[in-house]
């Protein structure tokens, strides 16, 4: 979840999906 928060702070939606 934390990783998703960081990614969502400076990444695109599709990149966030890859993070999860």
From Swiss-Prot:
Role, per record: Digests most rapidly at the C-terminal side of alanine residues, but also cleaves at valine and leucine residues.
Family: Belongs to the peptidase S1 family. Elastase subfamily.
An example molecular function term from Gene Ontology annotations: serine-type peptidase activity
Name of the protein in question: Elastase
Domain Peptidase S1, residue spans: 1-20
SUPFAM superfamilies: Trypsin-like serine proteases (SSF50494)
Lineage: Eukaryota, Metazoa, Chordata, Craniata, Vertebrata
Enzyme Commission identifier(s): 3.4.21.-
GO BP term (any one): proteolysis
Keyword terms, alphabetized: Hydrolase, Protease, Serine protease
Transmembrane segments: none
């Amino acid at each position: 979840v934390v990783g998703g928060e960081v990614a969502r702070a400076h990444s695109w939606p599709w990149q966030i999906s890859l993070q999860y």
